[in-house]
Amino acid sequence: VILVDVNVLVYAFRRDAPNHQAYADWLKELIDSDTAFGMADLVLSGFVRIVTHPAIFDPPSTVEHAISFANQIHRHPRCASIAPGPRHWDIFTRLCRETCATGNLVPDAYLAALATESGTDWITADRGFARFRGLRWRHPFD
């Protein structure tokens, strides 16, 4: 099972994002396939936060449009909701310590711990996730 990062959703959603069409095609292929995939509420809320942020996009997406897109994914029959389990906090704190994660790297460590604990492959456009020991990750186009 794969778990998809915020950036992949943003690039697939926003027509003005870099490589939008390639990401949109990748996501459509995933959704149209028979493959199960995971999604975390933190990823979906992060997606809504980013695409509706006026300092990031001009014009920003409407909340309704962003939530509608997120709901299509979240409610998909092959989408499994991935949530922190009993080992998550220990994995998260280990990753924070090992990488000296501070500031904006802290949520990355949180998501890396979520993928690690759940045994999913993390799909992201951010190659910086390579810093997290034990995380299975790949770029969607690799």
Where are these regions (language model features)?
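Acidic, PIN/NYN-like endoribonuclease modules and their adjacent C-terminal/linker elements
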Residues: V1, A112-D142
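Short, well-structured N-terminal submotif of metal-dependent ribonuclease cores
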Residues: V1-M39, P54-S68
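Generic structural signal for secondary-structure transition and capping sites
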Residues: P18, D32-T35, I56, R75-C79, ...
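Short beta-strand segments at enzyme active-site cores
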Residues: G38-D41, I82, T124-A125
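Short, hinge-like loop/turn segments at secondary-structure boundaries
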Residues: P54-F57, T99-C100, H139-D142
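Active-site neighborhoods of divalent-metal-dependent phosphate/nucleic-acid chemistry enzymes
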Residues: P60, R78-I123
